[in-house]
Each structure stands twice: as C-alpha cells, then as structure tokens.
C-alpha cells in the first residue's frame, strides 16, 4: 500500500518509464522524458516527504530558507552540511586561474568510472568546501552561484535598474487582496540566464486563496524525477506552510506542474528499487516559532513521525 503522496510520485515514475521518450540532454547522460504532467498534494493530510526512500528534511529546509533569504552563496548551505549545490560552484572554481590542482575536467562523469580519479576529486572538493567555510574572501569569489533563485525571488532587477522584492510583494498581496490572480513569483529572468550557475528548473509559482486556505502551484520546466522532484515537492509544500502561517491562513493544496519530467538513464535501477517498496504514513510539519518567514531558522522547524525506507544513492548530472 502507498499513502497518497508516495502514490502520486510513484505514478509519475511509472508513467515516464512506460511511455517516456528516450532523449539526449545537456549532461550527455541520456534520459527518458515526458513533456507535461501534473501532481496534486492535499497538504491537510500531512507533509509530503516521501517515505519509499529517505528524503532529508534538513537539506530541503535549509535550501528553501537560503532562497527566502535571497542568498546565492553556498557558504550558508555548507554551514548546515548541505552539499546539493557544491558541484556548480566547484565547476566555476576549477575553470578559474586560481585553481592549480589536478585536471578536474568532466569530473561528474569521470568520478563515476575512474576510482583513482574519484579519490582525487573527493579530496579537491573537500579542500574547496573547507576554504568556502573558512575564507570569506574565497567564498565571495567562488561560492556565489550568480543570480539564481534567491536573487530573483528577493531582488529582481528590471531593465532600468530598479529592484523588486517579488516574495515580499506576493505575501502582502495575499494578505490584502487574497482573490487576486497575480500572486506570482518567477525565477526565470531571461536577461540574466547567462549569469546563473544553473538556470532555474523550478521557474514560477502562483498562490491561490479559497475558504481560508492557501494553495500553491509550481511550474517546473525541467525535473530530475529521482533526485530533484522529491526535494521540490517537500520544498514548495514547506513554502506554502510558511506563507500560510505568515498570512494567517491554513494550507490547501500543492499542485506540481511539469514541463520536461525526466529520469536519467543511470537512475533507472534506483527508481525501480524505490517503486518496489511500500510506503509508511506521511509525517507532519511543526513550525515552532512566530517569527516572520524572513527571520525563521531551520531550528524553528520540526518534522514529526517521519518513518521511511533507507535512502537510495544515485549520481547527480552536472
């Protein structure tokens, strides 16, 4: 048996495996892909942290709070031992004149196929992370990912150089004009794509208020189904909870709409392992603070009664 959250995710995986198109991709890994899909999660029934594999709430929450703070430097994430953005910052570093270590070209693929190189890569990454944490000047130069999510959410700059805080504006709109159809935040800024370490995969979200409940719909242009989507589901569910609390509302639905939803060819075995598992009951979320969404910390958040199967490792495509 599967709870409704795991069942929705499993249905996406199964459909892509069954009818998806085999495609090449930017990372030269290869994918099975479906264009256009939608999942719905009733947040009143629990918190959608998948249980058929362990998903780290700490990683989900610290990344989201990083976005909310408008931060774009991995130093904040590394202080919470959150490594999910390391590869993109590291790639910029090894391409710079500052780097003088062993050749790290195409480290993502080489680390998977060459054990000796993998040890070199892990050592270089370890040194890189340590310098980011200990050397603020180095972190400022090589830890920053450019104008990624947090920058667009909190400090969108228009063609005239005016700065606009999308997230704060949307929260005020929800409070004062809940029926508006303009509760939208976009991370997709076409004029700044080239200034981002990775263009936004989850590109735009919209809020909807009905009967005192706040719902959120995300449009995700590109979705790594195995590694990314479980985090994205939990992240936007958490964002919905935080904004609902900020606005004095209950939570409604999280609606997840996909463009290119894909399974990487080297994730298929891992996906099939997960699909063979039964689920546990979903956990619940507690927000143990009355702080503003802009001041809340990871330590103020708590996941209650989370039981899951073990995590399943798979390589990230860079």
Curated annotation (Swiss-Prot):
Q: Which domain of life is it from?
A: Bacteria
- State where the protein is found: Cytoplasm
**Single GO molecular function:** thymidylate synthase activity
User: What reaction does this enzyme carry out catalytically?
Assistant: dUMP + (6R)-5,10-methylene-5,6,7,8-tetrahydrofolate = 7,8-dihydrofolate + dTMP
Where dUMP binds, per the record, is at 26, 181-182, 221-224, 232, 262-264
Which pathway does it serve?
A: Pyrimidine metabolism; dTTP biosynthesis
List all disulphide bridges recorded for this chain.
Answer: none
Explain the purpose of this protein. Catalyzes the reductive methylation of 2'-deoxyuridine-5'-monophosphate (dUMP) to 2'-deoxythymidine-5'-monophosphate (dTMP) while utilizing 5,10-methylenetetrahydrofolate (mTHF) as the methyl donor and reductant in the reaction, yielding dihydrofolate (DHF) as a by-product. This enzymatic reaction provides an intracellular de novo source of dTMP, an essential precursor for DNA biosynthesis.
Task: Report the HAMAP family cross-referenced here.
Answer: Thymidy_synth_bact
Q: What is this protein called?
A: Thymidylate synthase
Organism of origin? Staphylococcus aureus (strain Mu50 / ATCC 700699)
The organism's taxonomic lineage, starting at the top: Bacteria, Bacillati, Bacillota, Bacilli, Bacillales
Question: What gene is this protein translated from?
Answer: thyA
